[in-house]
Amino acid sequence: MSVRVAVIGTGVMGADHARILTSDVPGAALQVICDANGTRARELGDQLGAAHVLTDPLEALSRADVDAVLIASPDSTHADLTIAAMEAGKHVLCEKPLAPTSQDTQRVIEAENRLGERRVHVGFMRRFDPAYGAMKSAMEDGLVGDALMMHNFHRNVTAPEWFTGEMAISNSAPHEFDICRFVLGSEYVSVIAVQMPSKNAIAPVFLVLKTAGGQIVNIEVNNNAAYGYDVRCELVGSTGSVDLKAPVHATYNASLKSVQRFDADWRPRFADAYRLQNKAWINGISRGATDPRLANAWDGLCSILVAEAGVVSLQTGTWQPVSSPDVPALYQGAKANSSLIVPAE
């Protein structure tokens, strides 16, 4: 039997998720396309053959013929829609962030704990990227010795004029926060963020984080790199390293030059990760066995707590502690990072 999915939000991410579900995920049925923009929803619904097209998300997630909800609406709606979907008995995959603030994320966690079962997952798709997977396996297999540090950079082509350094930390960097925590298996304990002033565009933000396991993580977020979308990472161990480079799709040789082209945004780079994540989500629902790589609501909270500390650090220029609340029993046990190293009391 197919898992009947309602996709809420038909912007860039929502439309991509809907296409992935219809073309690349056996066992998924696109039951509802929902967006406040009815024209856009109808165009996508007709294109993909959705059974229903709606403009009211609460109507979409409360339907008896919907088993699961994929939320890709504006960030400010995520918490309320996730809670409503849970209370309607649905499974949820929510694009990051699960909520814009830790307080709203706690509301989601409290609602899920009242249910007594995990129904919420967060779209940290890099956990399914084959390159990051190889990096994590190399560390766990002891191929590079003990993990010492991770270097990261996250570069986008351009950002709007209103995009701030605080937004770079809260909107862009959470992918690095999550994947480094996932690979290292250790919680963050402190962070410092710096940014040089810029006259013409938002300047890069640089973050350094310390983990409970004694590792250092650094992250460059540059949202005006101009040349293309580029994400790279290096895991440094005591006896070696693992280097995640930009994938080369094609190299053009002409006029005495060799040119490598970069993607314009993140979707081509992480196409496999999105596809594998969505497959894992649907398979977990249909088989009743969750893929341990899927990020849960607690993982969503952890990324937001780091981001909030990072924003304070950027504003004050000082190291900031990262909050580390006790993990509820619901989020302990069978998961990929169940052995996370946590700060000492």
Where on the chain are the PLM-derived regions?
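Hydrophobic residues in well-ordered beta-strands that form the structural core
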Residues: 14, 54, 71, 94, ...
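Contiguous beta-strand/loop segments that form the cofactor/metal-binding neighborhood of enzyme cores
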Residues: 171-250, 275-289, 308-310, 322-345
